[in-house]
Amino acid sequence: MVYKTKLGEMEISDESIFTFEKGIPGFEHLRKFALVFPQETFPIGWLLSLEDPEVGLPVVDPKLVRADYDPVVLSEDLEEIEAENQEALLFFCVLTIPPGKPEKTTINLRAPIILNQKKKKGIQTILENEDYQLRHLLSEEMERSKTVV
């Protein structure tokens, strides 16, 4: 089906659509989002609202940025997305890219987007791990990961 999104009109398959029962913080009124990976921004993907074409969040697999990223998901979050455990879940973290200053891009490792691909449900949760903050400078995290791997 074709949707109007922040990135323009896009053909989006049902496999890419996730329901966020409680919305996403800041966008609690929006429930349907699509995860897409346009070639021109890969490996950065986009979590696009299918209800408001102005809403789209750049996201990335946190393991690409921080090799030792190891979130622990609370049982109530697993229940909300109907997951038995966290092994089969997909994790993405939201990027903040300041206009004209991509070198100042930050990644939110504290509040990942968690997707249950099987049930097509998602949640953004806040992790209890104090090592993960809302804003980590992307370039510093990638440099740090080189020494971890």
From Swiss-Prot:
GO biological process: bacterial-type flagellum assembly; regulation of translation
Record's GO cellular component terms: cytoplasm
UniProt key word Chaperone: yes
InterPro entries associated with the record: Flagellar_assembly_factor_FliW (IPR003775), Flagellar_assmbl_FliW_dom_sf (IPR024046)
Alphabetical UniProt keywords: Bacterial flagellum biogenesis, Chaperone, Cytoplasm, Translation regulation
Main location: cytoplasm
The UniProt record lists the keyword Ubl conjugation: no
Compartment list: Cytoplasm
HAMAP family: FliW
PANTHER family recorded: FLAGELLAR ASSEMBLY FACTOR FLIW (PTHR39190:SF1)
Family annotation (NCBIfam families): PRK13285.1-1
Family according to the record: Belongs to the FliW family.
Quaternary structure annotation from Swiss-Prot or TrEMBL: Interacts with translational regulator CsrA and flagellin(s).
UniProt function note: Acts as an anti-CsrA protein, binds CsrA and prevents it from repressing translation of its target genes, one of which is flagellin. Binds to flagellin and participates in the assembly of the flagellum.
Protein name: Flagellar assembly factor FliW
Organism, scientific name: Thermotoga petrophila (strain ATCC BAA-488 / DSM 13995 / JCM 10881 / RKU-1)
Organism lineage string: Bacteria, Thermotogati, Thermotogota, Thermotogae, Thermotogales
Gene expressing this chain: fliW
